[in-house]
């Protein structure tokens, strides 16, 4: 069965369900260190743990895609020669300014890789870029895991 392609949407905050908004707040508490545990964070925002875990990996605050914004892609690649090079080629063709590349030691023939890049000068949208990477032979997963102002 083919894996369903992920799509991303921009949605006004006031249109989002309360559980999604509270999930973002709980994640921010954890990132800032204002909550030491998930339990503490969800209690502070009055959210169930099950709702937090349901949404935590799929909702992120959005910042305008503009110069000075970085994006991080987390990937799982097969441990074969040239796969990471092809991924970097797609990013280079899109004029992404790569800041960091981190690759873990392969385990069971798979390596976790994160690539962080600036969006200034980026040609094409992130959905198209991740789709092109996802279609490469040897790429098992591609997920945008964050973006931030630098």
UniProtKB/Swiss-Prot annotation:
Q: Which domain of life is it from?
A: Bacteria
* Xref: CDD domains: ACT_PheB-BS
Q: Please give the InterPro entries that the UniProt record associates with this protein.
A: ACT-like_dom_sf, ACT_dom, UPF0735_ACT_dom-cont
Identification of the protein by name: UPF0735 ACT domain-containing protein PTH_1602
Q: Which family does it belong to?
A: Belongs to the UPF0735 family.
Organism from which the protein derives: Pelotomaculum thermopropionicum (strain DSM 13744 / JCM 10971 / SI)
Domain ACT positions:
72-147
């Amino acid at each position: 069965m083919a894996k369903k392609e992920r799509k991303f949407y921009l949605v006004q905050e006031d249109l989002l369900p309360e559980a999604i908004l509270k999930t973002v707040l709980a994640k921010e508490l954890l990132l800032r260190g204002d909550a030491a545990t998930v339990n503490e964070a969800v209690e502070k925002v009055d959210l169930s743990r099950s709702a937090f875990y349901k949404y935590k990996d799929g909702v992120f605050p959005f910042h305008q895609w503009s110069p000075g914004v970085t994006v991080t892609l987390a990937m799982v690649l097969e441990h074969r020669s040239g796969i990471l090079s092809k991924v970097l080629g797609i990013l280079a063709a899109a004029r992404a300014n790569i800041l960091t590349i981190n690759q873990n030691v392969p385990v069971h023939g798979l390596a976790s890789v994160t690539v962080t890049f600036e969006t200034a000068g980026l040609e094409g949208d992130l959905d198209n870029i991740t789709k092109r990477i996802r279609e490469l032979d040897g790429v098992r997963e591609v997920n945008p895991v964050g973006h931030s102002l630098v």
